[in-house]
A protein has these predicted regions:
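Intrinsic-disorder/low-complexity, polar/charged segments enriched in Ser/Thr/Lys/Arg/Asp/Glu/Gln
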Residues: 14-18, 55, 65, 100
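Beta-strand/loop substructures that line and gate deep hydrophobic ligand-binding cavities in soluble
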Residues: 80-132
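Mature, Sec-exported extracytoplasmic domains of Gram-positive
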Residues: 43, 85-87, 91, 137, ...
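Hydrophobic ligand-binding cavity/cleft-lining segments
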Residues: 1-44
């Protein structure tokens, strides 16, 4: 997985991950853009309503949900939605038997929680890869904290 942080200001930038996935574009689309797909790698998320201005729902597990608005939806190549004050974007490029997934979190409001989100997305992308390769991917708390520290240093470096 390749990663790049395009810093624009002290508080804004784009965190980009690019990963080649085993699987055709429709299979990958179904993993990243449907409730059934999310259940496999990010079970707290469901699709309330697909399409532009539709909703992605984040279940806090206590009966409360956060709604994120879908801002771009072009099956099977593009899904973009609000993520707190930022935006996440999944772009798929068909390579036949494989698919390139380019994930971007556009950071317009950098907070102390943002590195935690980026570390989480890093792990989610590895889970997606594992699902498509029929292998289990799990992380320890120490592995998560190492990723968190890495992205905290990257996002907040002067």
């Amino acid at each position: 997985m390749q990663e790049t942080y395009n810093k624009q200001t002290d508080k804004t930038g784009d965190m980009i991950f690019e990963i080649e996935l085993k699987g055709d574009i429709e299979t990958v689309w179904n993993l990243i853009a449907t409730t059934k797909g999310f259940e496999q790698w990010f079970p707290e998320i469901s699709v309330g309503e697909p399409g532009v201005n539709g909703l992605i729902l984040f279940d806090f597990g206590d009966g409360q949900y956060e709604e994120s608005t879908i801002t771009a939806y072009e099956p099977p190549t593009l899904l973009q939605y609000d993520w707190d004050k930022n935006t996440v974007r999944f772009e798929l490029t068909d390579q036949g038997d494989t698919t390139i997934l380019t994930f971007t979190e556009s950071i317009v409001h950098l907070t102390t929680h943002t590195p935690r989100d980026i570390a989480g997305w890093h792990m989610c992308l590895q889970r997606i890869q594992g699902i498509l390769e029929s292998r289990e991917v799990s992380f320890t708390e120490d592995e998560f904290l190492a990723l968190f520290d890495k992205y905290q240093a990257l996002l907040f470096e002067k």
